[in-house]
Every structure is written in structure tokens, then in C-alpha cells.
């Protein structure tokens, strides 16, 4: 199991280090200035904010968008909870990453690149835990005047753990923590900074 985990981590590391947008990337993600946050709600009333520390992404010249999240980088501010999420919820040995793909109209990018602020409704495909689902997501794209684009969700996105076969993992987390309940509905917010590819 340890060797398999190391091999998966090596493959993921190579993917993260590779030029994520290939030759056609117009903008590449600045991981250090980007954030994907999600909220877990336990015992029906206690909310806690978590995040991911490592991801790569790009926007292509044709408006194709891809974001890959390293699930092993989950950060809950409690080390043992990080490990439980990796092992019991995400099963990162088998499913080391989540991926979002979308298509943005070139006109949206052109307007934002001129310094504009554009709101767009996008069908975003989320691939997680071996399953895929298309999510309607409202995003705001802001041109920052230096060739960079900031993209963020206009409102939180609700993801249902059951849609991705994660409900047994949620139950496992609930049991090991001795909680009465953990919600399967998870609000997610995204804030991304893309810089012009070199």
C-alpha cells in the first residue's frame, strides 16, 4: 500500500510539474494566489472551512479551461483530520486528484483581457472519485490590466457527496469522530488567478 501511494504521488507530482496548458495555453494558474475552499457542516449547526493547497490549471486560446486539484493537499488545520479526509473520504491512493473542465466563450476572455468585468454561466464538468457530473456555475472574470485574469465563483457551488460516491466516506468520518451527523451537501467557493503563459 505504501509503495502504491508513493507511485501515485510520483505520477501526480510529474503531472503537476508538467506544463499544464501545453503549447496552446494562453493563461496559466498561479497556485500561490488561488484558492478552492469548502465548508463541512457537522451536527447540523457547526460549519468548518477547509481548502486545498496544491492545484494546476490553464485557460487555452480557444477558451478551454482545466483545473486539477491535488486531493492530498487538503487542509483542515488539524493534521489528523487531514489524514482522515485523505484516507476515508477521498481515498487518494486510488483517486489522487479532482478535475474541473469547462469552455469559456472567447468573447468573454477578450472583454476581460481588456480590463473588463464579465459574468458568465458555465457548465463545468467535475471529475471526482471516479465519477463525473456537470455543474452549472456562475463565474466572474476580471481582467487585472497586467495580462492576468482573476476568476471566481459569483456564488457558492453546492456539491452533493452522494453524486460522487462519497457518502460512505462521509459516514466513516462521522463515525470515527463520534459525530451525530455530517452533511452530504458541501458549499464550495473558487478564487483563481491566471497569468499570461510565457
Annotate each PLM feature.
Residues 2-11:
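Bacterial N-terminal signal peptides that target proteins for export
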Residues 4, 21-25:
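Extreme N-terminus of proteins, especially the signal/transit-peptide cleavage junction
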Residues 10-19:
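Bacterial N-terminal signal peptides
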Residues 25-198:
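Low-complexity, acidic/polar, glycine-enriched regions of mature
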